[in-house]
Amino acid sequence: MNPVELPAPAADRELVAALRQDLLAAEFTNERVAQLLGADALAAMERDQLVPGMLRIAELLSTDGTPDPCAVLAGLWLLGLDIPAGQLQAALPRLGVEGLRRLNLVHPAAAERPTAEAHGTPGADDAERYRPSVDLRPYQAEQEQVLVDLWVASDLPAAQLQGPLHPEHVLGIGGASLTLAASIHRTPVQRALEIGTGCGIQLLHLLDHAEHVVATDLSRRALDFTEFNLVLNAPALRLDPGDLGARVELVQGSLLEPVAGRRFDLIISNPPFVITPRPRGEQIQARYTYRDGGRAGDELMAELIGALPEHLTDSGTAQLLGNWEIQDQDAWDARPRLWCAGFPAEVDAWFIQRDRQDSAQYAETWLRDASTQRDPESYRRRYAEYLEDFGSRAVLAVGFGMIFLRRRSVDAGSAEARAITPWRRFEELTGAVEQPLGPVLGATAARAESAARDPQAVFDTVLAVAPDVTEERHQRFGAVHPEVILARQGAGLRRSRAVSSAAAGLLGAADGEYQAAALITAVAALMADESTDQEDLEQALRSEVLELYVEGYLSES
């Protein structure tokens, strides 16, 4: 079954303005949709199961009189139902069916597609029914510290299609995009860059705190979706729909090529990092542009990570998602460490591995993502290609995670620049975290820079145990002393780490009354004995306190 590519939405300013007014009048928002569908149907939709929602919408649309406009739009765009023209006209009176067609948002239905009538809605001829050409759904983003209702258009999701995705598929709101949005440390910046913008979800957030944003994508189709979404949400984003270029620059091209020689205060990306076999005779047009950058293995990530520092301003940061090949189960970070090996000393790097999959699991994940299983012969062939490809590089697994880079602001050639110790952190945190993570990541990186720049200043600071930190002791029954003492965070990254008895004593005494240096001296004096020198204990405690401070177990009082 060949995938079908539908036209991208048109960004006609007058028609989009009419659509915006209709969506507002229909209250087509997350809150209203949740009220209409109910918790069970919403939960099923998150699992790509549409039947409960279809049944609920059929019930709502079968009532006498004019149907609820929000129910009509939810049935059309969230559930992929074929909707009678009269109901669409009533739900979107300013734009109308003709306007919907001119914007490429709907097209005439075919008999084999699901209809509301199949679930009890009064009928109409197929010629009078329309089906969605795009996925258009409510979204919320913070603008000037207030959550505002927005809408995001993208290609139809796999659950609404009958075959594999088209190679030029434009992805919509998904888990990865939401994870990235929640992980960005948001501070006011002049210039921001998004690499691989897709349908522009991240732009909706960036425009709240960036004066000017450049968004790149290899796909012209993706940029068309992005332009449509910007025009549709222009008033909420403080954009002039007639002059998007005043704040937004949409550029077609691969990765950083379109911005050669330019620097940015913030760079973010959910890049096309998916590792894909490169079989002999592969056709470029068969690649999934939204996820496949055309390189072998994880070379795209290596290329992108290696080039990012030269595009960062002083104090500039880059945050992205990515994955990396693992050839040694005990050294998941070998590839990320290699990518950072050539960084200047003033560039900090932090990799957090959130998940890992063995090679077979990885293949299955991305074959399902493209709905390849709907063509069994193609699925088996592509699965074999994945395993052969991983085997050729002795890849055992693939790690997924978040990446945070920052260029410190130092004068090149200065004594400070020469004395810099790079902050390179690689940690595996696969447990639940508290979102949004952005403030936590930003604060951690700032503390790391402070500790590296002037550790004595940390010791001269009054520190207290963070309010979410608890102590956990493990010991055998009847034992006098614990064998393991853990400090556990209840918020943010929710780390847990083993601490020494001395550090546990210091944490117990860190109530915000004393400088860290005084606590270190007092605890070391109490715990020193014939076998433990006080000076050695103080030195060990100083190192441990710096780590506890950077990781957020200790905070400034």
Residue ranges, per PLM feature:
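Acidic, low-complexity/disordered tracts enriched in E/D and polar residues
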Residues: 2-71, 130-132, 160, 410-508, ...
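Long, charge-rich, low-complexity alpha-helical segments
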Residues: 69-132, 182, 193, 198-201, ...
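SAM-dependent Rossmann-like transferase core, predominantly class I methyltransferases
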Residues: 110-192, 197-209
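A general structural signal for short secondary-structure junctions and capping/turn motifs
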Residues: 142-144, 290, 310, 392-397
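Short beta-strand micro-motifs in enzyme catalytic cores
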Residues: 150, 399-403, 484
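S-adenosylmethionine
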Residues: 165-176, 186-187, 218-381
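Conserved SAM-binding motif I beta-strand of class I
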Residues: 212-217
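Flexible, glycine-/basic-rich loop-and-beta segments that form/coincide
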Residues: 359-444
